A protein has these predicted regions:
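N-terminal targeting signals for Sec/Tat export/insertion, comprising classic cleavable signal peptides
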Residues: 34-72
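Asparagine-centered strand-capping/turn motif at beta-strand->loop junctions
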Residues: 49-53, 176-182
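Terminal connector regions
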Residues: 101-153, 222-247
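Bacterial N-terminal signal peptides that target proteins for export
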Residues: 2-14
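Short, hydrophobic/aromatic beta-strand segments
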Residues: 55-63, 186-191, 242
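Intrinsically disordered, low-complexity Pro/Gly/Ser/Thr-rich segments with frequent PxxP/GP/PP motifs
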Residues: 71-103, 197-223
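N-terminal signal peptide c-region/cleavage motif recognized by signal peptidases
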Residues: 22-24
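Beta-sheet-dominated interaction scaffolds and their linkers
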Residues: 27-50, 155-170, 204
Length: 247
């Protein structure tokens, strides 16, 4: 079972425990969805966590703005998560309420944050103050969290479909440049350049609102013409396919 020392030390454990992302090890806590969208007009939103494991877990949830080395107290983001710390028994769930506090965020574009869940197993029953040489692993899951202001033009799906692509060559090699002229984040999960009879893999990256991102084309040494096929991840976590002509 959990004791007071475990709860008291959770904030320290957040940055001193050995952390494993969900992509490298199997976490027992499952988040409802692979991304979260918070519409500005919503008073709050609910995120559900499920413990798929066989042991009770102590769970802390927080948001960061990309600086994941900072503690939640240092970041001071305009959101409150209730409860921030909870115990979830095996095969049980916990609903978290996320509330926007109305502090100033850009009104003309989405803001990108990250939702974090840290799960810490209980101390073994035979653990005591004199016997602390036991390794406990803390697992962290981290997914994208989008704050979406009201009244943005177009839609997230239209933004993904209307990305334009150009090509440039510099000291790093030949790159495709994705231009996002929309107020939405475009999460790109795959890019390929089709030129003549050849298809080139591209090091894909997501593109922030009103910005551009250069992506290195593997195996290409000079600029060319052709078509760009790319995949984006939508609000529901599904994949949408797109193809357009290189400009």
């Amino acid at each position: 079972m959990f004791n007071a020392s475990v709860i008291k030390g959770l904030k320290t454990a957040l940055f001193t425990a050995i952390l494993f992302s969900a992509s490298h090890a199997s976490a027992d806590i499952v988040i409802s969805g692979t991304r979260i969208v918070y519409p500005e007009s919503s008073k709050d939103i609910i995120v559900n966590l499920d413990n798929r494991g066989a042991k009770p877990l102590l769970v802390q949830s927080w948001l960061d703005d990309g600086r994941d080395e900072k503690s939640p107290e240092e970041l001071k983001l305009p959101f409150v998560i209730t409860p921030p710390v909870s115990r979830i028994d095996p095969k049980q769930g916990q609903s978290l309420r996320i509330t926007y506090m109305g502090h100033s965020l850009p009104k003309d574009r989405e803001s990108l944050f990250w939702f974090n869940v840290l799960e810490i197993p209980p101390k073994p029953k035979n653990a005591n103050a004199e016997n602390t040489n036991q390794l406990q692993l803390a697992f962290r899951t981290r997914i994208k969290f989008f704050f979406r202001p009201d009244g943005l033009k177009g839609s997230a799906l239209e933004a993904a479909d209307h990305v334009t692509w150009t090509m440039k060559k510099d000291g790093n090699g030949v790159s495709l440049v994705a231009h996002n002229e929309s107020p939405y984040n475009v999460a790109i999960s795959m890019v390929k350049l089709k030129s003549g009879q050849k298809t080139y893999e591209v090091a894909h990256q997501s593109v922030l609102p009103f910005s551009e991102k250069a992506m290195l084309v593997k195996g290409l040494t000079t600029t060319t013409t052709g078509k760009v096929a790319y995949e984006t991840i939508n609000d529901n976590g599904g994949v949408d396919n797109h193809e357009t002509t290189l400009k």
